[in-house]
Amino acid sequence: MKQAYAAISREKAKPLVLECIGIDEPRADEILVRIVASGVCHTDMVVRDQGYDVPQPVVLGHEGSGVVEAVGSEVRGLVPGDHVALSYAYCGKCEKCLTGTPYYCEDFFGRNFRGTRPDGTCPIHDSHGKQISGCFFEQSSFATYAIASERNAVKISKDVPLELIGPLGCGLQTGAGAVLNCLKPKPGSSIAIFGAGAVGMAAVMASKIAGCTTIIVVDLNDERLELAVEVGATHTINARREDSVKAIKEIAQAGVDFSLECTSSPKVFRQAVDCLGTPGTCGLVGSSALGTEGTIDIGNFLFGRTLVGVVEGQSIPSEFVPQLIEYWRQGRFPFDKLVQFYDLDDINQAMTDSESGKVIKPILRMNH
């Protein structure tokens, strides 16, 4: 058993607790990763607050990056010493996985949010030897070591800074993939992006890569809106001071070709649909608590408008994460501008700063 140090969510909506844990050796199809860093994502906080019913106590974290330390006997594509970014989990066996859409895996929710392996076990034990929930996105990377699978580990070139790339496995691939893999705007298109967090900012950068000539960002934070311009936005709207739908239609006279809702707010969801032109497509990527409802004008869809939900940017991580790294190398995806680093011991401060809007993408460094 490997000894590790982890942040554990023990109670609903309470600060995480730093504790020593034990981690079992990897099974035949698993790998043990020495975590170098892990991004903090909105979904981690939704689960901490039990918006998704993952059993507590639980080790969260799903934007991990690190070095492979051990591999199971059936692992063929990775060896100890490989650098990896960890992404979402999928079964690899269902029809969706076998036809190239693992983000629609029939066991997606179970694999990522069950808190255990499919057989009900978990490789994580507390200091008293009691099994606690983990396997979060098949990684639980708010820890110095994590068990993952070969499927959700993306091999990365060793000249790429490991501490930086973890968020590519979830939040950044979600925003960028929503644009490049799902909406697929043609050069010259217009897009409105609601929410200038990590997902929204990644979407801004991807919209510029795609050749959109009108990129409108809506948020409540002026500093974030200024940064949005720096990474590619052509227009910004502070929704505290302006009617966002009206302002968007003043910029794009007939409404925008595409919109992306990244806030998980039902009110903003309505605005993201209402600002569309005819036809137009709204992508929904905000991570709302289960049971959240929103209202829309059904008449909007009589004129060719489309609403599409986007999971993990409709990305195949082994293909898309390296693509994003290449865009970063070229200076076209400067996601490092979004990042602030924290030590694992400061995880609760990192979450507070993220929720307050002070920081866009916190990344936790592990002290080994």
Predicted feature residues:
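Short N-terminal strand-loop motif that marks the start
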Residues: 1-67, 140-148, 152, 366-368
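N-terminal Rossmann-fold NAD(P) dinucleotide-binding loop
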Residues: 200-201
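Adenosine-nucleotide cofactor-binding segment
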Residues: 193-196, 205-271
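Glycine-rich beta-strand-centered segment in the early N-terminal region that forms part
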Residues: 24-38, 51-98, 103, 155-160
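Rossmann-fold dehydrogenase core element
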Residues: 280, 295-337
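C-terminal hydrophobic helical "lid"/dimerization subdomain
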Residues: 1-2, 270-274, 318-368
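NAD(P)H dinucleotide-binding glycine-rich loop of Rossmann-like/cofactor-binding domains
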Residues: 23, 95-194
